[in-house]
Amino acid sequence: LHSKASFWLGIALAFHYLCSMKNNLENIYPIFDRMLSRQDKEHLLGQRGVMLWFTGLSGSGKSTVAIALERELHRRGLLCRILDGDNIRSGINANLGFTEEDRRENIRRIAEVSKLFVDTGIITIAAFISPTEELRQLAADIIGKTDFKEIYISTPLAECERRDVKGLYAKARRGEVKHFTGISAPFEAPTHPALSLDTSVCPLEECVLKLLQLLGIEP
């Protein structure tokens, strides 16, 4: 009799455990429906989240333009976040190298992080060479076409080389740096960017002005 009682007690406890698991699952997953919406966050910030994806050769002026835009947005009381090689390669992508597979994973992670910022209502700028259409399309698919604006910093190769204080282009031409974009690795120029900026002829202030206009922000 004791063994039968123990058996049925075990069954009852197991049933109770399974029911509690079901309740926990029902309580866990719907939490996303109760979180603040993107619209709530954008309303709080008084701005709309958007992705500005800067692409171009090394030395084209991606980071320089991005920083100038960030300062202008900050001056206007708008929240902006820049993602570039310095803060990404030293952090969440520190374990990645420069193989084709790692380059793709690098862009994928950047896009996923960018999407989180955009969904929070933050004006997000990614400044990466991202040399192929495939990589930029990967980022656009993750972030969403509506929020993704491709900005081509189209400064010519000769000017990028002239600006290169680190001598990376010279090393690449001597064969000391392998797979260097623009020299020993190709760069696929965007065919239909939202905006194209050649910093060799367009002053920095004018670049910022054009970006503000693209964002629908009054000069």
Language model features with spans:
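Conserved lysine of the Walker
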Residues: K62
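Small-molecule kinase domains that catalyze NTP-dependent phosphoryl transfer to phosphate-bearing small molecules
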Residues: S154-K210, I217-E218
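ATP-dependent NMP and nucleoside kinases share a basic, alpha-helical "lid"
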Residues: G91-F98, S114-A172, H179
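Conserved substrate/cofactor phosphate-moiety recognition/catalytic segment
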Residues: I67-E112
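Hydrophobic anchor at the beta1->P-loop junction of P-loop NTPases
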Residues: F54
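The conserved Walker
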Residues: S58
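Extreme N-terminal, non-catalytic leader segments
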Residues: Y17, M21-M51
